[in-house]
Swiss-Prot record:
Protein name, per record: Dipeptidyl-peptidase 5
Functional description taken from the UniProt entry: Extracellular dipeptidyl-peptidase which removes N-terminal dipeptides sequentially from polypeptides having unsubstituted N-termini. Contributes to pathogenicity.
Keywords of the record: Aminopeptidase, Glycoprotein, Hydrolase, Protease, Secreted, Serine protease, Signal, Virulence
Entry EC no(s): 3.4.14.-
Broadest EC class assigned to this enzyme: hydrolase
Taxonomic source organism: Trichophyton equinum (Horse ringworm fungus)
Region of interest: Disordered: 269-291
Biological classification of the source: Eukaryota, Fungi, Dikarya, Ascomycota, Pezizomycotina
Entry-linked SUPFAM superfamilies: alpha/beta-Hydrolases (SSF53474), DPP6 N-terminal domain-like (SSF82171)
Length: 726
């Protein structure tokens, strides 16, 4: 009955206008990864859904039957932040954010088949998440993470003393990172244990900080680190975690170590791959990730890059023996793909890894002792893999994924066999009705140096005999890609269903097409990538008759925003009716204001003061480029974007206004490099789509398309005339 109510609630938000609207997009249910029980019969996953009428996002937890794909409601308690399996039949352990300890969380035990019979095992005195558990004798050892104080205690924001001043004082970097000014607290992995008495478990509230004894270490590493940054051995006795190299400047270098430490913290954690260490392969000193123990706990597999200041270098699989002085082994090191996650099969003989390949996140397998020349085998599945877990002790895995046409794909994949579909959101959610793979196709075009891939995304009800304006979307990174995956921010299908055909290119600098294409953007931001885009645009103009390039638009965020600004000052800028630049750099020298200096120092071949000419080479604000500007442009920049200052967007808008070019500035004071809050996201879509629809002519040809006037936010306009009216 509860499941039926959930579906009925979804029906209430289905749009009666365009096929796939921003409201549909934002309010469609969002599902987390599905985690199977030890026997491989059920999986639990988180689900939430935004309600525009009530302005809230209720959430809960569902169960997925791994035999038939049926879904049932486990709980609708929005205070439960995570659930995992206890390892004992269908028993589960979960974290509840509402606790008797102010600012703390509760650890609860229940059964997936009788959730209402839950009991509290104990409290944690602070925010705590990322539980991983393993039986150790008569106890269940666990690890998780929270913030640490300088003394090594779990930080509790609610219990912290209020500072007498708002001053911040720094003697080293980072000052701020992503969206936050760095404070004295830092992330740390903590260990604890559940003790069994009778048929119940209890937790005494005692945690051991495993990271604090290593001065300047931090794990998980912000801003995006999580439970994938550490692991617990199957016997519960040993923990592995990754941290930036404590002895090196974190804002300038990406060097990361994998540390090993006893679960009880009886010894200080030690790195197994220290730079220039006796076990570390020669010249390997880049970022490490994804540490995971073998089933017997004797080996650790992890991923590592070679270059010490390059966050987009190729990752290679490494295997280290625990408690040994033997050199770390590199596995399939010649494979020209960059794996993202690695896991062991239950017998410890096979590795399963995910890696981006030709704009799709794929699952691969390879022997744990593979030679350097070995090429991993693809496991068949649909869409891109977000996460995967083994189904019981079998070779099959439960994949949680998505695609350009569905925001959730639950499927079982087995090496050498067809995949087995369990649940695809586009076949169930009314908001996603009509979405499917038939409206997506790849495009390959000769670029500046090699063939370049793009996605073509067509609107619902596409008719090849009609003509649709071009929406030319440029991805960020620049070392990133438009993949066959669902985005909760820039979603090509939302743009297409306004009445466009979207072309989403993967030019020089993109990932998943071999490391050379990724590396070739170094110190060439406005070179080969721009030429690739010109060639793709020309191919579309000359060979795809159902795309109208005369009334097309171009838009991009981050590096894509830079590229839109670059295009505005070049010939390609005159080919579009409108431009949209979201969080893009404008003044070349302003890049020194970023947070992660290793990024710019790699991409521009040196520091700001030693290689200044490289920063200035790709300066969109050069007078000779600004002189060419004329295309209407929407500029978006947010106050908590510490990747590049909001002043970049304001400066760009200043110049557009002084030149008398139709332009608008959109700012969210509470958003970061991304726009993630539902109501802000709706305004963002209303402004962006309204802007391009106005200039492309879509508003005239499609009366149901979004208009700028659809946005309820009042526009600030205090000038009767532009500067050049005088």
């Amino acid at each position: 009955m509860a499941a039926a109510k959930w579906l009925i609630a979804s029906l209430a938000f289905a749009s009666s206008g365009l096929a796939f609207t921003p409201e549909d997009f934002i309010s469609a249910p969002r599902r987390g990864e599905a985690i199977p029980d030890p026997k491989g019969e059920l999986a639990v996953f988180h689900v939430s859904k935004y309600n525009f009428d009530k302005k809230d996002r209720p959430s809960g937890w569902n169960l997925l039957n791994l035999k038939n794909g049926d879904i049932s409601v486990l709980t609708t308690d929005s205070d439960i932040s995570e659930i995992t399996w206890l390892g004992d039949g269908t028993k589960i352990v979960y974290v509840n954010g509402t606790d008797s300890v102010k600012g703390g969380v509760g650890i609860w035990i229940s059964d997936a088949k009788n959730f209402g019979n839950a009991y509290k095992a104990g409290s944690v005195n602070g925010a705590f998440s990322g539980l991983k558990l393993a039986k150790s004798g008569d106890k269940i050892n666990f690890v998780g993470y929270g913030q640490s104080t300088t003394k090594g205690d779990l930080y509790n924001e609610a219990a912290a003393k209020e500072a007498v001043s708002s001053a911040r004082i720094y003697d080293s970097l980072f000052v701020r990172h992503w969206d936050t000014y760095v404070g004295t607290q830092f992330n740390a992995v903590f260990s604890g244990a559940l003790t069994k008495s009778g048929d119940k478990y209890s937790f005494d509230g005692k945690l051991k900080n495993l990271v604090h004894p290593v001065k300047y270490a931090e794990s998980p590493y912000p801003p995006f680190g999580g439970s994938g940054d550490y692991d617990l051995s199957s016997d519960g006795k040993t923990v592995a975690f990754m941290s930036k190299a404590p002895e090196l400047p974190k804002a300038n270098l990406t060097t990361t170590y994998i540390f090993v430490v006893p679960h009880d913290g009886s010894r200080v954690a030690e790195p197994i791959n220290k730079r220039n260490g006796p076990r570390t392969p020669q010249a390997i000193e880049g970022a490490s990730s994804s540490p995971v123990f073998s089933p017997d706990g004797k080996r650790i597999a992890y991923l590592q890059m070679a270059t010490k200041n390059y966050e987009s270098d190729r990752r290679v699989i490494h295997i280290a023996e625990v408690g040994s002085n033997k050199p770390v082994q590199r596995i399939a090191s010649n494979w020209d793909r960059s794996p993202e996650v690695v896991k062991w099969s239950s017998d410890g003989r096979t590795l399963y890894v995910t890696a981006e390949d030709h704009a799709t996140g794929k699952l691969f397998t390879l022997p744990a002792d593979a030679r350097d020349s070995h090429k991993p085998a693809v496991v068949k599945h649909d869409g891109s893999v977000s996460s995967f877990y083994f189904v019981g002790s079998s070779k099959s895995v439960l994949i949680s994924g998505n695609s350009l046409w569905s925001n959730a794909l639950f499927q079982v994949a087995t090496p050498g066999r067809p995949n087995r579909k369990l649940f695809y959101a586009n076949e169930h959610d009314p908001e996603l009705k009509g979405l499917g793979p038939n409206d997506i196709e790849p495009l390959w075009v000769d670029g500046a140096r090699t063939k370049i891939h793009s996605w073509i995304v067509k609107p619902t009800g596409f008719d090849k005999n009609k003509v649709y304006p071009l929406a030319f979307l440029i991805h960020g990174g620049p070392q990133g890609s438009w993949g066959d995956s669902w985005s909760t921010r820039w979603n090509p299908r939302v743009w297409a269903d306004q009445g466009y055909v979207v072309v989403a290119p993967n030019p020089t600098g993109s990932t998943g097409f071999g490391q050379k294409l990724t590396d070739d953007i170094t110190n060439d931001w406005g070179g080969a990538p721009y030429k690739d885009l010109v060639k793709i645009w020309e191919h579309v103009r000359d060979h795809i008759k159902y795309i109208d390039t005369d009334n097309g638009i171009a838009a991009g965020a981050s590096f894509g925003g830079f590229m839109v600004n670059w295009i505005q000052g070049h010939d390609l800028g005159r080919k579009f009716k409108a431009l949209v630049s979201h969080d893009g750099t404008f003044v070349g020298s302003s890049k020194i204001g970023t947070d992660e200096l290793f990024f710019i120092e790699h991409d521009f071949n040196g520091t700001f003061f030693e290689a200044r000419q490289n920063y200035d080479r790709w300066d969109c604000s050069k007078p000779e480029l600004v002189a060419k500007w004329s295309t209407p442009q929407l500029v978006i920049h947010n106050d908590f974007d510490f990747r590049l200052s909001v002043a970049e967007g304001v400066g760009l808008f200043n110049v557009l206004q002084e030149k008398g070019i139709p332009s608008r500035f959109l700012n969210f004071p509470d958003e970061t490099h991304w726009v993630t809050k539902p109501e802000n996201s709706l305004v963002w879509h209303q402004q962006v789509l309204g802007w391009i629809n106005k200039w492309s002519g879509i508003n005239k040809s499609n009366p149901k398309s979004i208009k700028l006037s659809d946005c309820p936010i009042e526009v600030v306009d205090h000038e009767a005339h532009s500067y050049f009216d005088y």
